[in-house]
Amino acid sequence: MAESTAFHDLATFLALPRVSSLALSPDGTRLVTAVQELSADGTRFVGALWEVDPAGQRPARRLTRSGRGESAPRFLPDGTLLFLSSRPVADPGEGEEDKQEAALWSLPAGGGEASQLLARAGGIGEYTTATGSARIAFGASLLPGATDAEHDERLREARRKAKVSAILHESVPVRYWDQDLGPAVPHMFTVADAAEGGAAAVDCGARRAAIAQGVALSPDGSLVAYATAVGSLPDEIRSVVVVANAETGKPLRMLESPEAEFDAPAFTPDGRDLVCSRSRRVTWDAPGDVTLWLASATDEQDAGRDLLPDFDQWPGAPVVSPVPDDDGAPVVYFTADENGHGPVFRLSAGSGELVALTASGTYSDVVVSPDGGTVYALRSAVDSPPTPVRLDAAAAGQQPVALPCPGQDTVLPGGLTEVHTTAEDGTALRAWLVLPDGAGPENPAPLLLWVHGGPQNSWNAWSWRWSPWVAAAAGYAVLMPDPALSTGYGQHMHERGWTHWGGTPYDDVMALTDAALLRDDLDGERTAMMGGSYGGYMANWIATRTDRFKAIVTHASLWNMYSFAQVTDFPAYWMRRQGDPLVTTERYERESPHLRAARITTPMLVIHGDKDYRVPIGEGLALWNDLARFEVPAKFLYFPDEGHWILKPNNVRLWYTTVLNFLAHHVLGEEWQRPDLV
């Protein structure tokens, strides 16, 4: 009998600790991470800060505890630990209403009680610190007409008392993912010393923070760089990086281009230059590209230069070492998807020398020690949840040293292998294959095909939302292909799928499925397909093309490309790729699954959240109505209070339960069981 694991029981699975983010103290002796766990009543995930021993000798130690949780740890130069929390300053029962906005809190370096440093009526958002200054930069919003924080608070109180919720828009966009934008406008502020409070905060400018992320302070705190968005017409809106004087708020320069997006700024150790992410904008026939860009922080005449002209993958946000190389050039670390993994890379900005520090796994939240000799990061993989690790800052192909932290003793209900094949055009294709315990020639496992979202994405990291191990615990094998449009396989992989999202990617998915089913430990007669977002689009596309699967689960999926392009939260991107649906109809006619609804015969489970603004609920409703119209066996799992992702613990439990019950009915031939509470 197979060993029971946390994945065999959804309550136990949801209670597993979830590690995210890292912060390193200025002296390099303290490493802090955030760990989410279930609340006592099981209805929320609550974060807490834990200190991890950088040497890996001592067990992790919990630093914070509150009902609201803590996140986003960062250090000040004196060792004070900062974090965000919506915990109340005092018991709300003693007076003030508990409004639950996130504020900036601090823990003294020598220990003691946490105290609130900065609070705003609309909450504190993205923030950062300087390595050699007490200055802090933080994001907060102001209502139109507000002249300062106090005025803003009065205006908010007036809206609350009047019970006004209306938002008057005069520009696009109006929504982003699951957020309604406005009426308050995000701004970037700096404060010379957070201990003095926010009254003296300097306003460095309004920003469209929802669609442009990243803020950095120069080491001495004199400059602030932050991403924002410019442009008024939908097709003109793009992300740029603004550099401002952190003491006065005066803008000094802007990194921008009509053909590119800039974000994720990081200063070099001397504060003179910036390293940013630069993304070429997509067009009708080109899928865009990503690189890292080096430019002067203050000289507007310096257009900058590409740091990775010959690198064929897409780098993530740059992290600049506090110590330059022997020639005085900046040393930049970044991660990038590569062949089903996500290594940490080290780049010398002077020589262009590039080294992959890791051989396997996918990394995030990279931080560098003060002496530049050690790198810390979170490592995950399809078969390993995120955990903090230590790396030598220069050695290639390392196996990282795991540092003791909650959530490391996870036993899996199966194993992981790979499937390889070759596309018709000669492109090498690969996929991960999760095999449940007990699968073999005498007991072949039913197969689930999972197509990832994006579509410019990769199955290369742990997922709590789409865990193949929950499916494996139920006895399924899970095939996780990286077809055309996936990241980590060079620019050619994007280009070969860009002009027909239902063409080459579909062919690749089918080719990898066929290759997997050559194995004698998989049952080709019991198969199903699942996907979310673009993966949901592919689910719908597959449903109109073949009846080979016993069931299809489509989550947050695109159905009618004509209507979708007009109502998604960021239509400019889609129109640049697809054209105006009222003028250039070719791609819509070729790619929209709804035009082929009458072909569908496979039973389908449709899942959608009402607060999904990326793929609005109308897509799920239209699909559901078409399935009913053509009498396709189907069910519709609707979440009125969720967005593109299902995040609330008991909704997550219901998501998995409904999916598994639907599959058991149609793939395994079991009687349908309606989940409890729906």
Segments predicted by a language model, with ranges:
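Blade-terminus and WD-like Trp-Asp/Gly-His loop motifs, strongest in beta-propeller folds
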Residues: 23-30, 72-80, 127-135, 215-223, ...
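Predominantly five- to eight-bladed beta-propeller fold
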Residues: 46-48, 95-101, 141-191, 238-239, ...
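Multi-bladed beta-propeller domains
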Residues: 1-18, 52-71, 95-100, 105-123, ...
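Residue position within the beta-strands of beta-propeller blades
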Residues: 31-35, 81-85, 137-139, 223-227, ...
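Beta-strand-rich domains and repeat architectures in extracellular enzymes and scaffolds
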Residues: 11-47, 183-186, 215
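Active-site-proximal cap/loop segments of hydrolase catalytic domains
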Residues: 481-678
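Short, solvent-exposed loop/turn segments at conserved positions within beta-propeller repeat blades
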Residues: 41-46, 90-101, 179-184, 233-239, ...
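Cap/lid segment of the alpha/beta-hydrolase catalytic domain
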Residues: 404-519, 523-525, 532, 564-571
